[in-house]
Every structure is written in C-alpha cells, then in structure tokens.
C-alpha cells in the first residue's frame, strides 16, 4: 500500500471515530438534560378559590410563577361554602381563597387554616336582561325568575338574601327565586334567559377584563357591612405561605384592582 493510500485510510478512520464520539456526547447530553428535568419536577400548589375569582386568579398565577419557576399553581373553583366542606373532608388543598370571612374562620377554628389574610372587597349588584328597563325585583312579573346563589354554600347568595331581607323584599320574591351553585351560574341563567334578574358581584360583569354586554346592571345592592374576601393556607407547604405573602404585595393588589376588586 502506498504512503498516500495509507494516509487516506488513517484520515477516514479518524473522521469516523470522531463522528461516533460526537454522537455519543450528544446522546449523553440529551440523557443528562432529561435526567436533570426529571430530577426537578414542578411542585403543584393547589388553590381552592371562589368562582368569582376565576379571571383574576389566572393573572395572579402568572405573576407568582414569574418568581417561582419550579411551581405550578392549579385552581379548583366553586362556591366558598362547598369548597370549605371539601377541605373539611380532607380534599388536598394548599390555599383557600374565599369570597367571605366566615368559611375561612370556620376552618381556622378547627386548625385547618392559618396565615389568614383579608385580601379584597367586592360589590353585590342586581342584573337583568340587557334589553330590560326593569328597575327593581318588584318589577318581576308572575312567571319571571330571580337567580341567586345557594344561601348555605355561596356567599353571594347569602348576601342577596340579606339584602332582600333588609329591603323587606324577600316575601315578595321568594316564590320567584331559583338557586345556583355559584355566581357564574347566576350570570349564566340571566344571560340565557332562564332567569330575568339575578344577584352577582360587580367583578362578574367582566370577562378577560372587558365588561360584558350580555346583561344589564340594574342597581348596586348596598349592604350594611362590606363584602370581604379572606384567604388562608390550608397545608404546611412553604409555597402556600409564600402565596399568602404574595397576596399582601403591591403587585397582587394592583392585579386585584385591575380586575375591579377593591383592596
């Protein structure tokens, strides 16, 4: 074999070996990356939140996760009373964000909530069909309905009943009332025409931070006491504590105000 041929063979062998080495290094790098990812999975932070928080909670999650890259905040929405009952029965939850103070206080009394904080206020409003000119629940006709949340499990339902009692209107409309599992269902009933009026929170009139044109706000239903939202940690997770601290921050308060809550 000539010297030139020998050199050509040696060069070819070197190139092949180098290619194999690079391929192996790349494979090892991929395996290492996969291993690192699997070694550091995101921690789930489970938050049970009142249905009226379904929009703003997503904005709060986005802001919180900016500084907690290894946390995935998930939400379970419903009426505050129903959520509290789930927690009492052992449902896995790290934070409870209620639309009242009563349900948080009940958990706190039984050592099922701690680090509590009153983080927002809201306004009850009476809504009706977008084309309606009715001004009060007294204007409801015999076959028309008034939707409110379940009084025992939905704070907005309790507030609505309280308002009707305070205004001496309950006896006039009690036979027209249809009950809903949460305020979002009340809104849906009025939007779809299943009820001609309903009581919801002012914040429920906004979707994706835009005011709905599907219903008409008839009037604000002022109560003797303000509607106060309270939250509490329901597990010993360090991220539950950090979420509670986050709710006290200026950033969280600015987000709540942006979504029409009062802080």
Label every PLM stretch briefly.
Residues 70, 92-93, 195:
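Short, high-confidence coil segments that cap the C-terminus of an alpha-helix
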Residues 15-19:
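C-terminal motif of bacterial Sec signal peptides marking the signal peptidase cleavage site
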Residues 84, 90-100, 104-118:
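Short beta-strand-centered segments that line the small-molecule binding cleft or hinge
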Residues 7-14:
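Sec-dependent N-terminal signal peptides
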């Amino acid at each position: 074999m000539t010297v030139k041929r020998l050199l050509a063979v040696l060069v070819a062998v070197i190139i092949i070996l180098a290619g194999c080495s690079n391929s192996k290094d790349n494979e090892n790098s991929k395996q290492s990356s996969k291993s690192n990812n699997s070694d550091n999975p995101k921690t789930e932070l489970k938050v049970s939140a009142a249905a009226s928080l379904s929009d703003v909670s997503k904005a709060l999650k986005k802001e919180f996760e900016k500084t907690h890259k290894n946390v995935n905040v998930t939400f379970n929405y419903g009426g505050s009373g129903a959520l509290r009952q789930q927690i009492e029965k052992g449902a896995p939850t790290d934070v409870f964000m209620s639309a009242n103070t009563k349900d948080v206080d009940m958990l706190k009394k039984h050592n099922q909530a701690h680090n509590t904080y009153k983080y927002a206020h809201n306004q009850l409003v009476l809504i009706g069909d977008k084309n309606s000119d009715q001004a009060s629940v007294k204007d409801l006709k015999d076959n028309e309905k008034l939707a409110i949340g379940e009084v025992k499990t939905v704070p907005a339902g309790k507030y609505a009943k309280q308002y009707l009692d305070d205004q001496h209107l309950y006896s006039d409309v009690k036979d027209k009332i249809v009950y809903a599992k949460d305020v979002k269902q009340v809104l849906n009933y009025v939007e779809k025409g299943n009820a001609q009026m309903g009581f919801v929170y002012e914040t429920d009139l906004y979707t994706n931070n835009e005011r709905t044109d599907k219903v008409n706000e008839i009037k604000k239903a002022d109560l003797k006491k303000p509607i106060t939202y309270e939250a509490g940690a329901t597990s010993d997770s360090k991220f539950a504590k950090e979420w509670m601290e986050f709710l006290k921050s200026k950033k969280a308060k600015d987000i709540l105000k942006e979504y029409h809550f009062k802080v």
